[in-house]
Amino acid sequence: MISGVDPQTHLPSGKPRWLKVKAPTSPGYLKLKGMLRQGGLHTVCEEATCPNIGQCWHEGSAAFMILGDTCTRRCAFCNVKTGKPLPPNPDEPQQLALTAQRMELKHVVITSVDRDDLEDGGAGQFIACIQALRRVLPEASVEVLTPDFRHKQGALERLVAARPDVFNHNVETVPRLYANVRPVSSYAFSLEVLRRAKQLNPEGMTKSGIMLGLGEDEAEVLAVFADLRAAGVDYLTVGQYLRPSPAHHAVVRYWEPERFEALGQQALQLGFKRVSSAPLARSSFHASELHGVDNA
């Protein structure tokens, strides 16, 4: 079992009431599910078992996950499967753009699995998706939530040159916990990715997110906020970690909604342009509103 936490940590039995959501069954949810299946597309909503899937899909919003559903890394918090991925689908960018058009999206979020097996880490597929969206939905803003493209020379530069409206890369947790939570990744490298993205495109918005409940303390969280601001990050998301299965990292603490609200206020005081800090906040949850766009 991947844990890295004290097994004696005590938590209330079951999730707190503020984390309970209804099972997705609405007509809007089912309609969007059909659209995505028709396009042969994946979403991080499904693959990462996001608790907000019912609400987002009911409202006609989804975060597209490109480059397949199999990741080359294994992070202790993530529910996306690990293995040997298939080659990129050359039809995926056009399928994604046409589906976004049918959904009448004004803000499109694209993320991906890690593709360390590809020479460019998948940057070329991100670029192709951005270009397809610009052709089909020229008025829509585009947000990319990317891997770190570690050891992929020139990949980040090429992607930022495609001018996504929002460049998002999550640090996920505090540096002390990286060895257990993100063993193949580097906190310092992720900060550099964000810093470099802002340097390459100062007019574009940069964004990052962190999960709480993995064993961090408040001082460490505030230090991450300060690091992100120093890297020029504009938007911040802060949400509660939820354990996908017993094989994943344990939840050490359920942070109360009031603490999320207080942290959000402290983040705004540090100079972030916009902050989403709540137990169910996620990188792509209400991403359009965070960027000042209404997808409704």
From Swiss-Prot:
Protein EC: 2.8.1.8
Protein source organism: Magnetococcus marinus (strain ATCC BAA-1437 / JCM 17883 / MC-1)
Gene from which the chain derives: lipA
Binding residue positions for [4Fe-4S] cluster 2: 71, 75, 78
GO molecular function annotations of the record: 4 iron, 4 sulfur cluster binding; lipoate synthase activity; metal ion binding
InterPro entries linked to this entry: Aldolase_TIM (IPR013785), Elp3/MiaA/NifB-like_rSAM (IPR006638), LIAS_N (IPR031691), Lipoyl_synth (IPR003698), rSAM (IPR007197)
Catalytic activity, reaction form: [[Fe-S] cluster scaffold protein carrying a second [4Fe-4S](2+) cluster] + N(6)-octanoyl-L-lysyl-[protein] + 2 oxidized [2Fe-2S]-[ferredoxin] + 2 S-adenosyl-L-methionine + 4 H(+) = [[Fe-S] cluster scaffold protein] + N(6)-[(R)-dihydrolipoyl]-L-lysyl-[protein] + 4 Fe(3+) + 2 hydrogen sulfide + 2 5'-deoxyadenosine + 2 L-methionine + 2 reduced [2Fe-2S]-[ferredoxin]
Record lineage: Bacteria, Pseudomonadati, Pseudomonadota, Alphaproteobacteria, Magnetococcales
Record-level GO cellular component terms: cytoplasm
Protein name: Lipoyl synthase
